[in-house]
């Protein structure tokens, strides 16, 4: 792990970041049936829904009032292509394709709030990326694994058309060709081998070397949940997670941010020592809808853990500073003004919400590393 720490510190210095976000689950219907998922609801469930524009905007306004800068749209993949009920629900909103509705909700958020949309819509075709790029500051999709074995019967991704590795890799390539700032990552402990983890990290890095668009990689640990198909599947150990984080830091280009969810483990200092430099999105308003049994940590708690490990917590935007410096390449021109107003000189958030000072206080740029 010493080499992972050296790489992290040489490129990211003593700063560890987080993004203050609000989470909007635009729809919890999905055509995939992953064995570890508790987010997705069948259209016959009374809990199945597509959020209305009014609901989206109400959540966005609550987040804006709490100092959030990012709005994360997360949604199931293409439910309208599998379920008539999902197709009908979308039609009642005036749409035939979920991606088009998502794009209009991003535009609504940009028009009515100061929040920047980050879109996590799964696999995307070329025209879907083109539709979303002008209204999404960044996009994301977990690669999760490169293992085709896990698509077989009895495995985590059986009967999941969007979870075949080739489809995930094609989305990474397509977003790279269109210069979209992109988040991806691995889900650890769903049946993959160590070699398959390494292969997945290498595949992510290769597409980044071609296009330079991967802004962060998440190393996320599988968590069992009541009622899922993998309820009795073992969770990865702390040692397994730390080895994977360190391997990721060594394999990936140093400029790629490395993140691990802070609400899925309390061993924050261990994660920092293994090589991460970012805590991801944390919401003061909404729960983690993907892992609802795990509460977000308090920002002051993360700040204290970071300080104990020798780091200074800073708030970032959904776009990392490197992409802001090359905004003409990576960002639609319509987003430039909003980002300029929200970012300070070093590219981090102008208004720092660290729970130790008012959210509207701007810290001097000299207190943050040039990332």
Roles of regions detected by a PLM:
Residues 22-24, 77-79, 121-125, 145-147, ...:
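Active-site-proximal loop/turn and secondary-structure-junction residues that shape catalytic pockets
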């Amino acid at each position: 792990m010493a080499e992972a720490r050296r790489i992290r510190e040489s490129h990211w210095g003593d700063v560890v970041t987080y993004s203050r976000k609000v989470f909007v689950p635009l729809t919890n219907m999905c055509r995939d049936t992953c064995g570890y998922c508790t987010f997705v609801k069948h259209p016959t469930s009374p809990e199945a829904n597509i959020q209305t524009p009014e609901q989206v905007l109400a959540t966005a306004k609550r987040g804006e009032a709490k100092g959030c800068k990012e709005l994360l749209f997360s949604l199931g993949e293409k439910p309208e292509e599998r379920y008539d009920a999902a197709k009908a629900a979308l039609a009642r909103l005036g749409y035939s394709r979920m991606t088009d509705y998502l794009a209009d909700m991003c535009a609504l958020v940009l028009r009515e709030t100061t929040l920047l949309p980050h879109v996590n819509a799964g696999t995307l075709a070329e025209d879907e990326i083109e539709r979303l790029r002008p209204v999404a500051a960044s996009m994301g999709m977990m690669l999760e694994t490169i293992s085709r074995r896990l698509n077989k019967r009895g495995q985590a991704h059986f009967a999941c058309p969007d979870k075949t590795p080739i489809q995930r890799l094609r989305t990474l390539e397509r977003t790279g060709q269109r210069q979209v700032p992109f988040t991806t990552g691995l889900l650890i402990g769903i049946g993959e081998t160590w070699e398959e983890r390494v292969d997945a990290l290498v595949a992510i890095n290769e597409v980044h070397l071609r296009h330079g668009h991967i802004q962060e990689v998440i190393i996320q640990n599988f968590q069992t949940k009541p009622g899922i198909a993998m309820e009795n599947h073992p969770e990865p150990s702390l040692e397994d997670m730390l080895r994977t984080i360190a391997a990721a830091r060594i394999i990936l280009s140093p400029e790629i941010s490395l993140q691990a969810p802070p609400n899925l483990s309390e061993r924050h200092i261990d994660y920092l020592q293994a090589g991460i430099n970012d805590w991801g999105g944390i919401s003061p308003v909404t729960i983690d809808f993907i892992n609802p049994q795990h509460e977000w940590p308090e920002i002051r708690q993360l700040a204290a853990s970071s300080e104990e490990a020798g780091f200074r917590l800073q708030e970032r935007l959904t776009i990392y500073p490197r992409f802001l410096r090359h905004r003409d390449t990576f960002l639609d021109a319509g987003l430039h003004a909003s980002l300029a107003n929200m970012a300070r000189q070093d590219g981090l958030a102008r208004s720092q919400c660290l729970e130790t000072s008012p959210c509207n206080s701007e810290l001097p740029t000299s207190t943050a590393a040039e990332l």
